[in-house]
Regions:
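Short N-terminal secondary-structure initiator segments
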Residues: 58-60, 84-89, 148, 228-232, ...
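Flexible loop/N-cap segments at domain edges
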Residues: 310
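Nucleotide-state-sensitive switch-loop elements of NTP-binding domains
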Residues: 2-128
Length: 326
């Protein structure tokens, strides 16, 4: 059995990448989703019939280490999968995730085969300036880096960003194209090439750089970010969704770094297939679209009132509640 970690900062595109990657899945797979907020949304957006386990209300590298370990043990016993894909919270430090996963490497011989980091290249420099070492941690511990929103960035800017990334992590394999335009088989080929390069590097480097310590410090995200999440959401029209985009951009709810949700629709077009809006907001974009129930295999009856999650700083909870709740 192997563990694959698919990490990335808030809104980088981790869940979208996972859906792309697992679409060509040929092995028995289980996914662990970790959400910073109390309500898990990403599980509902995972497509296909792959088992998904949620660990919410914190980070699996810190306050939820015990839950994380127990989840992996339970998955091993129940499913005996060939691989476990872990999607940490967008505010997790990859170095801490690796410390926890190394326990299973030592105790059970489970290999951490890939440390994939999805980077929103459009917001890279802003995040680097705003979040410093906290943001750098994911990049410097990656074995593979893939870009989101690369089509929105000029080639000269891409080259400058690549130089900065190479300063942070000279050894990672960096895929310089849009991963959304390649197949899951091509993604697997990129990962396999990265694995071979890591093996070659180990053969020429005899120094032991494995950090086995499992001491867990206070999570820096607790000092930087806060989370607000709700169910029982009002029905929104398309006009309401456009207004939501403006409210987030102007700071009406506080400094929102990440927002996402599934919101009931009151549109006249609403039908059996289309009853909800899905929206996704990060530092560089706000997108919303109609979502069909058939595309939400993990959406159950308890979710029908909708879910909304906002992550940021100085969030105005009263305004958020009044705006979203019935």
């Amino acid at each position: 059995m192997i563990i694959q970690i698919i990490s990335g900062f808030l809104g980088a595109g981790k869940t979208t990448f996972i859906n792309k990657y697992i679409s060509g899945n040929k092995g028995k797979t289980v996914i662990i989703e970790n959400e910073f907020g109390k309500i898990g949304l990403d599980k509902k957006l995972i497509q296909g019939n792959i088992p998904v386990r949620e660990i919410n209300s914190g980070c699996i590298c810190c306050s939820l280490v015990t839950d994380f370990r127990e989840s992996i043990r339970a998955i091993m016993d129940e499913f005996s999968p060939e691989r476990i894909i872990i999607e940490p919270s967008g505010v997790a430090q990859l170095s801490d995730i690796l410390k926890v996963c190394n326990f299973f490497n030592r105790e059970y011989g489970i290999e951490i085969s890939d440390k994939i980091v999805i980077v929103d290249i459009e917001s890279f420099e802003d995040c680097l300036e705003d979040f410093g070492n906290f943001y750098v941690d994911q990049i410097e511990n990656a074995s593979v880096i893939m870009f989101s929103n690369i089509e929105k960035v000029e080639n000269s800017d891409i080259e400058r960003i690549l130089l900065k990334m190479r300063e942070i992590n000279p050894k990672a394999s960096i895929f310089k194209e849009d991963w959304r335009k390649i197949t899951s088989e091509e993604i697997e080929a990129i990962l396999e090439e990265s694995r071979k390069n890591i093996v070659k590097a180990r053969e020429t480097d005899n120094s032991d750089k494995t950090h086995s310590s499992e001491e867990h410090h206070h999570h820096p995200a607790d000092n930087i970010f806060e989370s607000v999440s709700f169910s029982n959401i009002k029905n929104f029209s398309e006009k309401d969704m456009e207004e939501l985009k403006e409210k987030i951009a102007e700071g009406y709810f506080g400094k929102v770094i990440r927002a996402k949700g599934i919101i009931p629709s009151d549109s006249e077009e609403s039908s059996e297939n289309f009853k909800y809006w899905h929206f996704d907001s990060n530092l560089s974009s706000f997108n919303f679209d109609k979502i069909k129930m058939e595309n939400l295999p993990n959406f159950d009856s308890d979710d029908k009132s909708g879910n909304v999650i906002l992550i940021g700083s100085n969030l105005k909870r009263n305004k958020i509640e009044k705006y979203f709740l019935k």
